[in-house]
Curated annotation (Swiss-Prot):
InterPro entries: SpoVG (IPR007170), SpoVG_sf (IPR036751)
Keyword terms, alphabetized: Cell cycle, Cell division, Septation
Gene: spoVG
Record protein name field: Putative septation protein SpoVG
Protein family: Belongs to the SpoVG family.
SUPFAM superfamilies reported in the protein's UniProt record: SpoVG-like
Job of this protein: Could be involved in septation.
Gene Ontology biological process: division septum assembly; sporulation resulting in formation of a cellular spore
N-terminal signal peptide: none
Disulfide pairings: none
Record organism: Borrelia recurrentis (strain A1)
Length: 96
């Protein structure tokens, strides 16, 4: 499965304490689209959060997620590459 498109929707945070940097849409093989991946700045660096929902008991469950670490790294790399390309001056890449 190939990543054929990555679209970044940056979040302009006026509140510097906000950790959300962007929402991402990824297209696979020009036939499957995954919306609402989030780019988050944490204490240890930047990482992605897969789309999730809150259950009735308050837990968050991923709707979709990579099955193995190698695909997660491919996905994260493609997202960060596009993010940096769109915003080179204001992004210090420290991956988690």
């Amino acid at each position: 499965m190939n990543i054929t498109n990555v679209r970044i929707r940056r979040v302009d945070n006026k509140d510097s304490s906000s950790k959300l940097l962007a929402y991402v849409t990824v297209t696979f093989d020009d036939c499957l689209v995954l919306h609402n991946i989030r780019v988050i700045r944490g204490q240890k660096g930047v990482f992605i959060v897969m789309p999730n929902r809150r259950t009735k008991v308050g837990e968050y469950k991923d709707i979709v997620h990579p099955i193995n670490q190698s695909f997660r790294e491919i996905l994260q790399s493609a997202i960060f590459k596009e993010y940096v390309k769109e915003n080179p001056a204001n992004f210090e890449l420290e991956l988690v």
